[in-house]
A protein has these predicted regions:
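Long, acidic (Asp/Glu-rich), low-complexity accessory segments flanking structured domains
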Residues: 1-33, 37, 46-72, 128, ...
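Active-site-adjacent pocket scaffolds in enzyme catalytic domains
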Residues: 90, 94-166
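Loop/turn elements at helix/coil->beta-strand transitions in domains of secreted/extracellular proteins
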Residues: 34-36, 74-76, 121-123, 154-155, ...
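Metal-dependent phosphodiesterase/phospholipase catalytic core, i.e.
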Residues: 34, 42-111
Length: 235
C-alpha cells in the first residue's frame, strides 16, 4: 500500500509473484509444524466502501481478518502495522478481537509467565498500536520495533528485525530467481546465529524468533531445541 504506483502492478505478473510470497504453507499448516508466532499485518483496501479488513504485506489477502480470527481463536496470531484504518475501523477491529478471543485474552499486568497464562486459561496477548488501546484492559501497549543496529532497550517487550528486501533492479536482473531463493541462501547463517541464542528471562535472552519459509528448513527444530535446552537448565 505504501509502494510506488508501478509496484502495484508487479504482483499481477507471474514473474513478480515469485518476489511477493514469503511463506509456502498456510497458517494452520505452520501451526501444525510448531510455529507459535504469526506476524499478520492489517489493512483496509483503498476505495473499499465496506468495513472489511484484510491482511497485507505488499499484497492483500482474499480472506478477511474476521474470518481468519475466528478460525484461529485457539491459536496465537500477532498483528503488526495498520494501513488505511480510521477511528471507526479501529473500534470495529478491537471489538472483533475481544469478541473472538473473549476470556482467552490476557489483560495488562506487570508480570506474566507462561505458567500464569496456563493457570488462568489465557491464550493470547494482544499489543495494539493505537491510543484506543488505553481504554481497554485486554489490550497491551505497543511493542516497539527496532532495527538490528539499535540494540539498547528499555524494560519490557520489544522487537528487533533484519529485513531481506529485493529491489526492482535485483528482480529484473535475476529473472529465474525468487524471494524464496534469496531467503534460503541466508538460512545457514541464520540457523548458526539461532543456535547461539539463550531463551529465558535474562536481560540477554531472546524468546521469539520470526522468519520466512520456516517449514522449508531446520528453523523450527532449531528453535524447539533451544526450548529443550531451557527446560534442561531449569530441572
Amino acid at each position: 500500500p505504501r509502494s510506488p504506483l508501478y509496484v502495484t502492478f508487479f504482483p499481477t505478473h507471474p514473474r513478480f509473484r515469485y518476489f511477493s510470497s514469503w511463506i509456502s504453507q498456510q497458517t494452520f499448516e505452520q501451526l501444525d509444524c510448531g510455529v507459535r508466532y504469526c506476524d499478520l499485518r492489517i489493512a483496509h483496501r483503498p476505495n473499499d466502501n465496506s468495513s472489511d479488513l484484510y491482511f497485507y504485506h505488499g499484497v492483500y489477502t482474499t480472506i478477511t481478518v474476521e474470518v481468519h480470527q475466528t478460525e484461529l481463536q485457539d491459536s496465537h496470531p500477532v498483528f503488526s502495522h495498520f494501513q488505511g484504518l480510521n477511528q471507526e475501523l479501529h473500534t470495529l477491529l478491537i471489538s472483533t478481537i475481544k469478541s473472538v478471543f473473549n476470556s482467552k485474552l490476557c489483560p495488562k499486568t506487570d508480570a506474566v509467565t507462561l505458567r500464569s497464562l496456563w493457570s488462568s486459561g489465557y491464550q493470547a496477548i494482544v499489543s495494539y498500536e493505537h491510543n484506543l488501546a488505553n481504554c481497554h484492559t485486554a489490550l497491551w501497549s505497543h511493542i516497539p520495533y527496532w532495527w538490528a543496529n539499535n540494540v539498547r532497550r528499555k524494560r519490557g517487550f520489544f522487537v528487533t528485525g533484519i529485513n531481506l528486501t529485493e529491489d526492482l533492479k535485483y528482480i529484473c536482473s535475476h529473472p529465474t530467481e525468487s524471494l524464496k531463493d534469496m531467503v534460503m541462501a541466508t538460512y545457514p547463517t541464520l540457523l548458526g546465529w539461532v543456535r547461539e541464542q539463550k531463551p529465558g528471562s535474562g536481560a540477554d535472552s531472546l524468546n521469539i524468533i520470526a522468519a520466512d519459509f520456516v517449514t522449508e528448513s531446520e528453523f523450527i527444530p532449531t528453535v524447539i531445541a533451544l526450548n529443550e535446552n531451557l527446560l534442561s537448565r531449569s530441572t
